[in-house]
Structure formats: C-alpha cells, structure tokens
Amino acid sequence: VVIKTLVFQSESNNSFVELIPMKPLNLRAFXL
C-alpha cells in the first residue's frame, strides 16, 4: 500500500492530499 501511495503522490500531489487527508504529516515530509 505504501508503494501505491508513493506512486499516486508522484502522479498527482493534489489528488494524494485529498485521497489521504488523514496523514498530512507524511505529505508535508515528502514535499520538503
């Protein structure tokens, strides 16, 4: 699941945020 999430985020950062709003910390770490 982690890999799938990573790929999704890479394809659409915005979509990832909306898809997984429960883990905003992870997204911020990746953005950094």
Swiss-Prot record:
UniProt PTM comment: Glycosylated.
Keyword match Transcription regulation: no
UniProt entry keywords in alphabetical sequence: Acute phase, Calcium, Secreted
Biological processes per GO annotation: acute-phase response
GO CC annotation terms, alphabetical: extracellular region
Main location as per UniProt: secreted
Subcellular location field: Secreted
InterPro entries the record matches: Pentraxin-related (IPR001759)
Pentraxin (PTX) domain sequence ranges: 2-32
Disulfide bonds: none
Family indicated by similarity: Belongs to the pentraxin family.
Oligomeric and partner information: Homopentamer. Pentraxin (or pentaxin) have a discoid arrangement of 5 non-covalently bound subunits.
Function: Displays several functions associated with host defense: it promotes agglutination, bacterial capsular swelling, phagocytosis, and complement fixation through its calcium-dependent binding to phosphorylcholine.
Name under which the protein is recorded: C-reactive protein
Organism: Pleuronectes platessa
